[in-house]
C-alpha cells in the first residue's frame, strides 16, 4: 500500500502520523527524536526498567525499537510471540513487554476484514486465546499479588475487503 496508514507509529509514540511522519513501511522519514516512542519515555523516567519487544513483524523492531529494548525477538510466529512472552514472564526478565501479533492482519488481507469471514473470526479467536494464555501466565507468577501489571490490547488498523480501511468507525 503506497501511503498505508501505519498505526504502529501512533501506538508507540502516542501522536498522529502528521507529527511522527511515518506513512509507510520504510519508516522514513520519521520524527521519533521529537516524538519518542514509549520505550524511550519509560527508559528516561525509569532507567533500570527491563524491557522486551517480541514481534511477528520484523520492521517493528528493526525500524523503531532496535537499540531501545533490552530483549529484542523478531520474526516469530504468533505462537512464538506468545511462548516467548510466557517465558519472559516466567523467568522474570522484563518489567515492560511489547508484543506484536500478525495472524489477524494476515487473515484480513487474505480473506477479508469482516465479521462475516470465518477465517478472520477464527484468527481473532486464536489471538484472544493466546492473550488469555499470556494473562494466565502473568497471574501464575509467584509475585503476582504484589505486582501492578497493566495489559493493553489494541488493534493497529481495521480494513475494508482485503485492504487497509479508512478512518471510519466501522473500520477502526
Mark where each language-model region is.
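Solvent-exposed coil/turn segments that connect beta secondary-structure elements
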Residues: 16, 102, 156-158
Amino acid at each position: 500500500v503506497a501511503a498505508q496508514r501505519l498505526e504502529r507509529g501512533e501506538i508507540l509514540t502516542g501522536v498522529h502520523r502528521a507529527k511522527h511522519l511515518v506513512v509507510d513501511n520504510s519508516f522514513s522519514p520519521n520524527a521519533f527524536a521529537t516524538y519518542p516512542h514509549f520505550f524511550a519515555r519509560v527508559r528516561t523516567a525509569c532507567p533500570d526498567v527491563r524491557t522486551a519487544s517480541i514481534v511477528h513483524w520484523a520492521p517493528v523492531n528493526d525500524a523503531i525499537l532496535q537499540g531501545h529494548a533490552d530483549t529484542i525477538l523478531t520474526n516469530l510466529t504468533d505462537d512464538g510471540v506468545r511462548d516467548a512472552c510466557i517465558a519472559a514472564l516466567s523467568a522474570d526478565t522484563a518489567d515492560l513487554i511489547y508484543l506484536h501479533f500478525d495472524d489477524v492482519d494476515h487473515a484480513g488481507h487474505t480473506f477479508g476484514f469482516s465479521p462475516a469471514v470465518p477465517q478472520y473470526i477464527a484468527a481473532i479467536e486464536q489471538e484472544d486465546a493466546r492473550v488469555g494464555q499470556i494473562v494466565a501466565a502473568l497471574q501464575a507468577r509467584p509475585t503476582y499479588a504484589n505486582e501492578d501489571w497493566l495489559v493493553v490490547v489494541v488493534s493497529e488498523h481495521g480494513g475494508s475487503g482485503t485492504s487497509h480501511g479508512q478512518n471510519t468507525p466501522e473500520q477502526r
